[in-house]
């Protein structure tokens, strides 16, 4: 028996894959499945926005995870018979003041230096 602590998107996904591989799985969570961080993130996958200085080694994993999402949702939809809606419309970071603008411009330059596909827009 394999025990998984946490019934968010990661714990449930790992449990699903292990069960599909014939393993016996039990998943524990202090609350309802999918109601903590997975619920709060609203299913957002924003590897371009989420990458931070000092986490450069994590970026390939973020990008690979994002690239697998379409295949993952198709398999989950097939196995669960529950329709899954997915949209890839990009992510918008908004500056509400000049300090925000400086932070976004700095982040933009950093993320472009990593080779991420980003565009800096102005409100004009």
How does the language model describe each region?
Residues 19-41:
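Glycine-rich FAD pyrophosphate-binding loop
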Residues 12, 35, 101:
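Loop/helix-junction capping segments adjacent to catalytic residues or to phosphate/diphosphate-binding pockets
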Residues 44-124:
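Dinucleotide-binding Rossmann-like beta1-alpha1 core, especially the glycine-rich loop
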Residues 1-27:
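N-terminal Rossmann-like FAD-binding beta1-loop-alpha1 element of flavoenzymes
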């Amino acid at each position: 028996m394999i025990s998984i602590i946490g019934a968010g998107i990661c714990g449930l996904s790992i449990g699903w894959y292990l069960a599909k591989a014939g393993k016996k799985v039990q998943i524990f969570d202090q609350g309802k499945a999918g109601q903590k961080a997975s619920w709060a993130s609203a299913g957002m996958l924003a590897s371009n926005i989420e990458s931070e200085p000092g986490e450069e080694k994590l970026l390939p994993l973020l990008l690979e995870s994002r690239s697998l999402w379409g295949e993952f949702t198709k398999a989950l939809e097939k196995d669960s018979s529950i329709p899954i809606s997915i949209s890839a419309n990009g992510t918008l970071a908004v500056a509400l003041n000049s300090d925000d603008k400086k932070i976004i411009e700095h982040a933009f330059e950093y993320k472009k230096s990593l080779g991420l596909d980003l565009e800096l827009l102005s409100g004009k």
